[in-house]
Amino acid sequence: MADKPDPSSPADGPEPLFSFGVIADIQYADLEDGYNFQRSRRRYYRHSLVHLQGAIEDWNKESSMPCCVLQLGDIIDGYNAQYKVSEKSLELVMNTFQMLKVPVHHTWGNHEFYNFSRDYLANSKLNSKFLEDQIPQHPETTPSENYYAYHFVPFPKFRFILLDSYDLSVLGIDQFSPKYEQCMKILREHNPNVELNSPQGLSEPQYVQFNGGFSQEQLNWLNEVLTFSDANQEKVVIVSHLPIYPEASDSVCLAWNYVDALSIIWSHQCVVCFLAGHTHDGGYSEDPFGVHHVNLEGVIETAPDSQAFGTVHVYPDKMLLKGRGRVPDRIMNYKRE
């Protein structure tokens, strides 16, 4: 695409400290093109794999090689379950990722749970928790096995935290379990509709079945990690499938209890960026506390002649997102101390 400068040369200035790749909502399926539920947006199920291959080729040849790639969830489409090809499609996408020369951190979205149970995912290649960094002197920063979340250090004084935004959810868990009952109760308290995927008439439209939320246990853990990062002057990037900031997202795509997550993040100094997928349209806003909320445009709704991924180049004073195709460039300055 000739309309953008060469993204592999981020700036005519100092070299970045490090870089990382971002991609969201690949939603691959071996199907002809289709449309979203409202039939207003086209989905390129088969071509999403070609887009992924193109992204990997670009990342592999960048002059400043990304240290890792963040895959923001919905790696294969829910249609795969209907046709009983979930494992086959996942294997195809994961084999494509093997061409990448750097590690991939995977978040889980609603389409993961349309295809697989939480137990299956925990034992699959989509569990990238083995890439975590631990802080032995601070056991309170070790996540519980009850949710899929972890943190890692890609570069000194920078910490990335992957959150489980379907920790509270009715998707992918045993319908006879206490957790399912608890989550269904939360959902029905906020959504009286017969069709639980419909936000019609809701004052809090995020309370639909295709979204989820964060348990208090996970939020307490997040608070502990951010407390450690504050004390150690770290800058933190948080990664989640679901967005949490209304100004950067369609309200129907937010995490159920996004307010709880925001209040914890806003009680700390260290968070500089919150990366999410899910919306497909993308979105961006800097909140009043200087946190940059970036919702990445989804691969699944990206035409064959475009692209949808990016590389974030990290500097001492800012992050530069160099987007490809539908993903715009963004300059994200850190808040002044």
From Swiss-Prot:
Entry annotated with the keyword Plastid: no
EC class (word): hydrolase
Co-factor(s): Mg(2+)
Annotated positions of the N-acetylmethionine modification: 1
InterPro entries linked: Calcineurin-like_PHP_ApaH, Metallo-depent_PP-like, MPP_ADPRM
Pfam families: Metallophos (PF00149)
Keywords annotated in UniProt: Acetylation, Hydrolase, Magnesium, Metal-binding, Zinc
Keyword match Zinc: yes
Sites where the protein binds Zn(2+) 1: 25, 27, 74, 280
Tissues of expression: Preferentially expressed in immune cells.
Reactions catalysed, as given in the entry: CDP-choline + H2O = phosphocholine + CMP + 2 H(+); ADP-D-ribose + H2O = D-ribose 5-phosphate + AMP + 2 H(+); CDP-glycerol + H2O = sn-glycerol 3-phosphate + CMP + 2 H(+)
Positions with a binding annotation for Zn(2+) 2: 74, 110, 241, 278
One GO MF term: ADP-ribose diphosphatase activity
Its EC number(s): 3.6.1.13, 3.6.1.16, 3.6.1.53
Family stated for the protein in its record: Belongs to the ADPRibase-Mn family.
Annotated function: Hydrolyzes ADP-ribose, IDP-ribose, CDP-glycerol, CDP-choline and CDP-ethanolamine, but not other non-reducing ADP-sugars or CDP-glucose. May be involved in immune cell signaling as suggested by the second-messenger role of ADP-ribose, which activates TRPM2 as a mediator of oxidative/nitrosative stress.
Subunit and partners: Monomer.
PANTHER family per the UniProt record, alphabetical: MANGANESE-DEPENDENT ADP-RIBOSE_CDP-ALCOHOL DIPHOSPHATASE (PTHR16509:SF1), PTHR16509
The protein's name: Manganese-dependent ADP-ribose/CDP-alcohol diphosphatase
Lineage: Eukaryota, Metazoa, Chordata, Craniata, Vertebrata
